[in-house]
Amino acid sequence: MKGFFVTGTDTGVGKTFIACGLAALLKEQHVDVGVFKPFLSGELASDPQSDTALLKNMSETPLTDEEVTPFIFKEPLAPYTAAKLEGRTVGLEDAVNHWKKIKDRHECFIVEGAGGIAVPLGEDYFVSDLIKALDLPAVIVARPNLGTINHTYLTAQYAKQMGIRVIGIVINGISSRPGLDEQTNPDMIERFCGVPLLGVTPKLEDASPTQIHHMIKDHVDVSLIMNQMQMGAEK
């Protein structure tokens, strides 16, 4: 099947905005797209402001909250830590089994992780292991400012070492008046990471669905993502 996994260099880099905008744009291009965010911490999926609600809204999937996000934890912590505090255990096979139940409901899926690529989801597995288990390529979302070259390079190299195909990188949240760091980091990241720079997206003051949609449409090369997905599906 077609699809990709949106991961990040850290928490709070804008994975949900990027995933939502890509879902909306693919939908606009008549792609039957679904969304899957298996782990959610510190929010209720039914909350209209939750990541799950935004993903469902912008993809227009008929999947239920529970199908999109089967594992929800009260505390805003790494899923493994949050689950331990509740006396719960979620194994990799549990996440994969939920995926198998929905993966044929849409032609294409956008899956969003939790935090960065090495965040622990369970006792013996990380986000990277989930990406591998779902057999999807990855889109990495990175921040634009000082220090991001190091974090993005480490994320991309780790993904490659894990055998994860990286479609490209989106640098999200660049300011309206970027300093030298934000001006120079995109070129350095593309050069050193050795994967395509899919786009550099602005910091949104109004993160409404419409603004998110236009941000992706104006600043991200979605055709490159589609081509990379097609190449992967044909292998």
Swiss-Prot record:
It is found in: Cytoplasm. Pfam families: AAA_26. GO terms for molecular function: ATP binding; dethiobiotin synthase activity; magnesium ion binding. Substrate binds at residue 41. Keywords: ATP-binding, Biotin biosynthesis, Cytoplasm, Ligase, Magnesium, Metal-binding, Nucleotide-binding. Its EC number is 6.3.3.3. Its cofactor is Mg(2+). InterPro entries: DTB_synth_BioD, P-loop_NTPase. ATP binds at residues 12-17, 51, 112-115, 202-204. Signal peptide: none annotated. Pathway: Cofactor biosynthesis; biotin biosynthesis; biotin from 7,8-diaminononanoate: step 1/2. The keyword Transmembrane helix does not apply. It comes from the Bacteria. Mg(2+) binds at residues 16, 51, 112. The keyword Nucleotide-binding applies. The active site is at residue 37. It catalyses: (7R,8S)-7,8-diammoniononanoate + CO2 + ATP = (4R,5S)-dethiobiotin + ADP + phosphate + 3 H(+). SUPFAM superfamilies: P-loop containing nucleoside triphosphate hydrolases (SSF52540). Catalyzes a mechanistically unusual reaction, the ATP-dependent insertion of CO2 between the N7 and N8 nitrogen atoms of 7,8-diaminopelargonic acid (DAPA, also called 7,8-diammoniononanoate) to form a ureido ring. Homodimer. HAMAP family: BioD. Belongs to the dethiobiotin synthetase family. This is ATP-dependent dethiobiotin synthetase BioD. It comes from Bacillus licheniformis (strain ATCC 14580 / DSM 13 / JCM 2505 / CCUG 7422 / NBRC 12200 / NCIMB 9375 / NCTC 10341 / NRRL NRS-1264 / Gibson 46).
